[in-house]
């Protein structure tokens, strides 16, 4: 086992605080409408320019292992805030730095660290309750656009684009951000359910000019098996032909004799058919087939539940207003599924999202919800250079997360004003003893730090403006962008309640742990040996010996 280096008490805490300050000082320059960019070196390609707090935090590693422990713990604050709300990472870091700095001063002055932590926790619980009372719902597109604009560093076009996307696909809809090819931002909306599977044969194409298959009011056969024998399909093909409609077959695969016969029938005009593979693999494929069945009012024909293709009747088939199939994608528009069944299916998937532990699984489940809800919107970000494109894409993604959070829990006055008001409302809060009261004061002082940092980044005097804002009430605050005071909500400066709440809770959680740290242990750097208590004696002995030798001469 490798030798360890151990530090105790104030020595350990001082090292840890240095690490916290390095990371927080790098992150907090990005806060607010006049926050600066941070340039991140990459081992290959051009450097990345960003204003995203968590992206800056992830890049920081310090050589000193004790300082690096402090850095890593604050990095956790930014990361957790990002995971919970998708934004507010810089605010969380600023709050954590303030709580840690003031808390460690109190510990050095002889306060009990555990009581300090209890005081901080008590203040945060009360603050979160007050935040919820201040929160107002965010449902109209104007408020959504304002939240998006603020989060995208006061970029009005981004805010409007996100509001438009949400208006078209609904609050449950999937909105993705991609790198565009032009200079302008674009919004591309796909209505209905789309999945990444195209036609199994180009002979199904009935729109040569677009290279697509288009079926109007088709029946939809869903089969959880490979179909290679045409005899299994004959009864249902005859029934569809008699009904005078077209047919879309979605199965694990359609091959051999079955596929050949479908192509011949289509080319001769006997019955208009198209076949595609079912999306996904394994259990996910079964789930997605069931989603399509719910959307189209059909039944998945599966031998697992005793259903056979040969005995399929028209009532087992789903229906949709229109289906468009390209080489790589299939879109089902306006399925006739029962609205109550669709909502039930969405609720079931939401339950799975809550239970999922993997981000990848959550993302895939969220996509399924969107496909059942209102469709998919793609925001294509445009810029002049690749470096600008990457920076802008990051801002748009942050803005998108912020608007989702705003729709979920509502909004409060932005620019750090909400936390100032909350601190004012709980200023009379007391703990069980004097040390807890100090902990409460530490938390209340920290709640001013986001406003102060926004003002500092705008080049103004933080104390003067903070005192002016504290002297007022409601959503009155300071607009650092226009350098004027006013009603933040009227000026469209809004923060999602969830973002502010998450930032405060995660900052207090990690800061509380750091304040109560008494000992730090890390591996000793290679090539070094720990200081031994008798090393000074050895040096003295050698010196004495040398002196004696000189005397002899």
From Swiss-Prot:
Keywords: ATP-binding, Chaperone, Cytoplasm, Isomerase, Nucleotide-binding. One of its GO terms (biological process) is protein refolding. Its EC number is 5.6.1.7. The keyword ATP-binding applies. InterPro entries: Chaperonin_Cpn60_CS (IPR018370), Cpn60/GroEL (IPR001844), Cpn60/GroEL/TCP-1 (IPR002423), GroEL-like_apical_dom_sf (IPR027409), GROEL-like_equatorial_sf (IPR027413), TCP-1-like_intermed_sf (IPR027410). It is found in: Cytoplasm. It catalyses: ATP + H2O + a folded polypeptide = ADP + phosphate + an unfolded polypeptide. Its main location: cytoplasm. Belongs to the chaperonin (HSP60) family. Together with its co-chaperonin GroES, plays an essential role in assisting protein folding. The GroEL-GroES system forms a nano-cage that allows encapsulation of the non-native substrate proteins and provides a physical environment optimized to promote and accelerate protein folding. NCBIfam families: GroEL (TIGR02348), PRK00013.1 (NF000592), PRK12849.1 (NF009487), PRK12850.1 (NF009488), PRK12851.1 (NF009489). HAMAP family: CH60. Forms a cylinder of 14 subunits composed of two heptameric rings stacked back-to-back. Interacts with the co-chaperonin GroES. This is Chaperonin GroEL. It comes from Buchnera aphidicola subsp. Tuberolachnus salignus.
């Amino acid at each position: 086992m490798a030798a360890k280096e151990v530090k105790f008490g104030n020595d350990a805490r001082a090292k840890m605080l240095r690490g916290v300050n390095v990371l927080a000082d790098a992150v907090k320059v990005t806060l607010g409408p006049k926050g600066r960019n941070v340039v991140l070196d990459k081992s290959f390609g051009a450097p990345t320019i960003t204003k995203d707090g968590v992206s800056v935090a992830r890049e920081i590693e310090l050589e000193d292992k004790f300082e690096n422990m402090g850095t890593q713990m604050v990095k956790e604050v930014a990361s957790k805030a990002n995971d919970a709300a998708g934004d507010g990472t810089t605010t969380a870091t600023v709050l954590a730095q303030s709580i840690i700095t003031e808390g460690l001063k109190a510990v050095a002055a002889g306060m009990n660290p555990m009581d300090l932590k209890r005081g901080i926790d008590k203040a945060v619980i009360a603050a979160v309750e007050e935040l919820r009372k201040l929160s107002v719902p965010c449902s109209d597109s104007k408020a959504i656009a304002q939240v998006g604009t603020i989060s995208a560093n006061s970029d009005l076009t981004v805010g409007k684009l996100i509001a438009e996307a949400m208006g078209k696909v609904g609050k449950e809809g999937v909105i993705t951000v991609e790198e565009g090819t032009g200079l302008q931002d674009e919004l591309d909306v796909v209505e209905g359910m789309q999945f990444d599977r195209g036609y199994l044969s180009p002979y199904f194409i009935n729109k040569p000019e677009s290279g697509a298959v288009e079926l109007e009011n088709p029946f939809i056969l869903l089969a959880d098996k490979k179909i290679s024998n045409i005899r299994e399909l004959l009864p249902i093909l005859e029934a569809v032909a008699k009904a005078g409609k077209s047919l879309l077959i979605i199965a694990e695969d359609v091959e051999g004799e079955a596929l050949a016969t479908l192509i011949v029938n289509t080319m001769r005009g006997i019955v208009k058919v198209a076949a595609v593979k079912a999306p996904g693999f394994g259990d996910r494929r079964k789930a997605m087939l069931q989603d399509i069945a719910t959307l189209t009012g059909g039944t998945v024909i599966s031998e697992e539940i005793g259903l056979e293709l040969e005995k399929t009747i028209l009532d087992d088939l789903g229906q949709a207003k229109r289906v468009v199939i390209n080489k790589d994608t299939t879109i089902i528009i306006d399925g006739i599924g029962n609205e109550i069944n669709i909502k039930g299916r969405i609720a079931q998937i939401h339950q799975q999202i809550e239970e999922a532990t993997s981000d990848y699984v959550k993302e895939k489940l969220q996509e399924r919800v969107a496909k059942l809800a209102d469709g998919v919107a793609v925001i294509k970000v445009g810029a002049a250079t690749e470096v600008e494109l990457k920076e802008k894409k990051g801002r748009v993604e942050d803005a998108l997360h912020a608007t989702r959070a705003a729709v979920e829990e509502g909004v409060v006055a932005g620019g750090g004003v909400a936390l100032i008001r909350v601190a004012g409302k709980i200023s009379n809060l007391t703990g069980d003893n004097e040390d807890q009261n100090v902990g409460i004061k530490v938390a209340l002082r920290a709640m001013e730090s986001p406003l102060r940092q926004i003002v500092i980044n705008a080049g103004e005097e933080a104390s003067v403006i903070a005192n002016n804002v504290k002297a007022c009430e409601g959503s009155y605050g300071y607009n650092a962008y226009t350098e004027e005071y006013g009603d933040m909500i009227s000026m469209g400066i809004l923060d999602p309640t969830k973002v502010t709440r998450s930032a405060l809770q995660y900052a207090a959680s990690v800061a509380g742990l750091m304040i109560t740290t008494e000992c730090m242990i890390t591996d000793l750097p290679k090539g070094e040996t720990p200081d031994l208590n008798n090393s000074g004696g050895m040096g003295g002995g050698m010196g004495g010996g040398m002196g004696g030798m000189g005397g002899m001469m």
